[in-house]
């Protein structure tokens, strides 16, 4: 397990060694001891798995209380994954980072205090992630995916959105972390 820094404080791309031969491959997809060395985090409580069709955009989601750290990975297909730092005390507050995730064994560590979302680039994509806290619907928030102030470069897309994601708050209006 190796970490590659991103442009946002405390967020990392994480790679794992993959061993391939004529039979297939072996990949240790997660190792808590190694992950804790990189991030200091050792308290995952939930695993989630979603499947999305091409053009679906999910997010940008976060919990204002019981903030969730997320270790995300795309296991089939391809997504454009975006995170936004909502921690007022962070030097990268209000900045975003985007990366394409696919079957290339990259994980993205999304620390607590970030909004997270992704856009499906292929016919379908399966996305798995671990969280450091449970889902609490009463604290669930959505940051508007196409907020002008943030200026996230999604490319020229017409996404399929849930009603919840259509009604996201602008960066100026959204709840933030102290």
Regions found by a protein language model. Name each.
Residues 1-103, 122-124, 129-178:
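Non-catalytic, conserved peripheral segments adjacent to functional cores
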């Amino acid at each position: 397990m190796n970490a590659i820094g991103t442009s946002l404080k405390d967020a990392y791309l994480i790679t794992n060694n993959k061993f391939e031969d004529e039979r297939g491959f072996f990949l240790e997809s997660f190792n808590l001891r190694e992950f804790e060395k990189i991030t200091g985090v050792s308290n995952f409580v939930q695993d989630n798995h979603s499947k999305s069709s091409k053009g679906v955009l999910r997010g940008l989601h976060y919990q204002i209380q019981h903030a969730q750290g997320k270790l995300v990975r795309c296991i089939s297909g391809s997504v454009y994954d975006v995170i936004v730092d909502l921690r007022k005390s962070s030097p990268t507050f209000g900045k975003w980072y985007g990366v394409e995730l696919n079957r290339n064994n990259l994980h993205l560590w999304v620390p607590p205090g970030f909004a997270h979302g992704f856009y499906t680039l292929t016919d379908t994509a399966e996305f798995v992630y671990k969280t450091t806290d449970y889902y609490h619907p009463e604290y669930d928030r959505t940051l508007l995916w196409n907020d002008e102030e943030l200026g996230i470069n999604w490319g020229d897309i017409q996404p399929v959105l849930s009603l919840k994601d259509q009604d996201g708050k602008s960066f100026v209006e959204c709840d933030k972390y102290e």
